[in-house]
Amino acid sequence: MAETLQTGLPHPASHLVRAVEVAHEAAVRQSPNGVRFATYGETGVADLDLDRMLEAVPTAITAALNANTYYFVPLALREATENLDVTHDAPASDKPESSEPAMVASAYTDEFSHSAICHRNVELGHGKRGVFISTRLMGDRFALSFEFFINVAHAFVDQAGIPASFSDLVWKQALSNVRGETSVDAWESRNLAFGRPANAQPELLQPTSRRNRNTVPSFSAKQRSFTSNALIPAGSTAVASPATLPQISAAAQQSAASQPAVDEKERGLYLESAFSDSVAIYLLSLALDFDYSELREREYPLLAPTALAARLRVIADLFPPNPTYEFAVRYRRRA
């Protein structure tokens, strides 16, 4: 497990500052691959670890992040802080309920951590956005890196969209009822796309028998009517016998029933979630060696490893790693 970011060492007295003030005062730098970033306060993150994480993002992705600057701060607070000691020059009475200012803690304290959030987006004006990431809420490099990469992935998808090669693969996997997903958002939107409850378990495929083991499963097989395929001579008229018409109707109904009605809005949300998840996991794999099981959560079953590997290979082909970084999928041998 990666080293902890919660060092437990004494730190200076923490105070709160408006996020916009941090953005104004902190020295913004740019990594060699083009990520704009800054640090503020007692982050607990070593410079080498931060550089390794930032430089893992392929240049083909950073080109779409021009509007974002990533601020690594001890704690970014999620909401109003009336009960906390705020030290800034703004009048205490000037607290509009609908637009509370985003606040940042200069160091970790238990009190501030109760109101902190993993990250907070702040509009800085002129089309620029600050993404304030709470480094001291993360237990280790794995958690911090994944939080950063998730934010990068969402920003990238918002700007670049979803490649057809990826969406085709993912939708094919969904049609085949592949086990699990990459996030609760992808899991729920996939279920909703097929008209299932958000937390439903997809129906298992019928087990194959010896007779049909090598055939295409019924959910993707093309339905054919049992009409004659004989050629009709030119100038003649084809007349279906009374016995054939019910067969055609039944075949048409069977074909329609075999194709589930798809909610296109939820389908789009599913593909977007699956793509941003896969980009984030791909970036994480470039920055760190980790076991796939570390991504497991209770709310949904984890995507089958072979299905994830297929998605990540598409991502790697689209956005090759930067120099000194390598993408690899290694399968663990069963004991």
Give residue ranges: language-model regions.
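Pan-zinc metallopeptidase signature
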Residues: 1-32, 209, 218-219, 223-227, ...
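A metal-dependent hydrolase signature that marks the N-terminal structural subdomain at the beginning
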Residues: 1-141, 318-335
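Generic structural signal of hydrophobic/aromatic residues within well-ordered alpha-helices
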Residues: 57, 61, 174, 311-315
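Intrinsic disorder/low-complexity detector
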Residues: 70, 96, 214-216, 231, ...
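A short mid-domain helix/strand-loop element embedded in enzyme catalytic domains
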Residues: 83, 89-91, 100-136, 174-213, ...
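Active-site alpha-helix of zinc metalloproteases
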Residues: 141-150, 154-155, 269, 273
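Post-HEXXH active-site segment of zinc metalloproteases
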Residues: 142, 146, 158-206, 210-238, ...
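Active-site-flanking alpha-helical
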Residues: 153-161, 280
